Amino acid sequence: MQRQHDGLRAALVAEGVEIVDVGGSLGDVKAVFTRDQAIAVDGGAVICRMGPVGADPGYGRRGEEAYITKVIANLGMPILRTINGTGLIEGGSFCFLTPKVAALGMSFRQNEEGARQLEDVLRASGTRLIRVPLTGHALHIDGAILMVDHRTALVNMARLPYWFLDELKALGIQLVYVWPSEGHAVNCLAVRPGRVIISEGCPRTRERLTAAGVESIEIDYSEIRKNGGGIHCSTLPLVRDRDGGRGTV
């Protein structure tokens, strides 16, 4: 796992990305999935409230919020809201579709109170939030859709309701469908518009991305995928250049 995580880090640096380490003595190996801990929006960050609570000390993800809060505060990035009370949200289930339209995948890791608190923050910048019920035991929306360019999305249609696919088309978003046996391909990372880092083992999906004008960089992430997440899960973009170039994760 460490070797593959180091490989992701090297790929990000090669793309001009500035990396900030969370650090801390996190006890759960799933803490590598920093995407879930916070959400970057216009003007600052929203600190999430994690779903899993460990029965024993050092197990479960509740508590990771404290580490990411310290990191973001030390960077001088405004914290606009901390999801509190009974609210639940994990960042892997949030995505921007356009600058003013976002989606939140609803599952047992997200609830209506969490969605309401996030919506309060987004409303201040004129951003609409679409609640998308996820299928079965799916946890996060990043296993179903990823924006790979300004108006192009990689999607796993088996994990999204039909009406939401129609909504994407109404927003003018071109849909690139993952190859049915390569569902993990969705959990990739756009490092700039039209360029993604993707897991090995997705040749047919990569062909479809290429046909849509999207470049892909392939890395081995198989061991970390066994831990229940992917490349997208392992990164938390904080700032992206307006020109689509370098960013900070």
Model-derived features with residue positions:
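The feature marks the mature, well-folded catalytic cores of soluble enzymes
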Residues: 1-249
